[in-house]
Swiss-Prot record:
This protein's name: RING finger protein 224
SMART domains associated with the record: RING
Family annotation (Gene3D superfamilies): Zinc/RING finger domain, C3HC4 (zinc finger)
UniProt cross-references to SUPFAM superfamilies, sorted A to Z: RING/U-box
Zn finger (RING-type) start-end: 24-71
Single GO MF annotation: zinc ion binding
Entry keywords, A to Z: Metal-binding, Zinc, Zinc-finger
UniProt superkingdom: Eukaryota
Pfam families assigned: zf-RING_UBOX
Amino acid sequence: MQDAAAGGPPGLGGGGPPEERTDCIICCSAYDLSGHLPRRLYCGHTFCQACVRRLDTPAPEQRWIPCPQCRQSTPTPRGGVAMLDLDLAAFLAVKAEREPARLEPLPLTSLKGSAITRQPAGLCPALGPQPHFPQPRYCCWGCGSLCCPPLGSPEV
């Protein structure tokens, strides 16, 4: 396994390719969707949220999180460690492990023969009462207007 300090790319926790690393290299706990969320520091190394909280050290005017692998400091966001970016690759890998398998989508060939006869329910919100505009019944040959009184009646 390559390490970021050895010149390799920082993976999940800095200990290898993203598909291999799903645990924190500090506490050896597997990442999860609650207390051990994978948080990425500015240097690119990833550790669980619980360990990053322990690394968060107050300085005189700002709080900094020193990376235990490369020692680069990451400023603590205003909302704390929970506001650091998630390591999305690790998070999605953990989420995929935890969620039940999804059903396969229907093949497109089975949908080709069925005609759409009406709009699926819930697609658009129900509209309230619509204004009613009366249809013009008369046409004036003189001015071309559709709203003139009936032919043969006196014009005003």
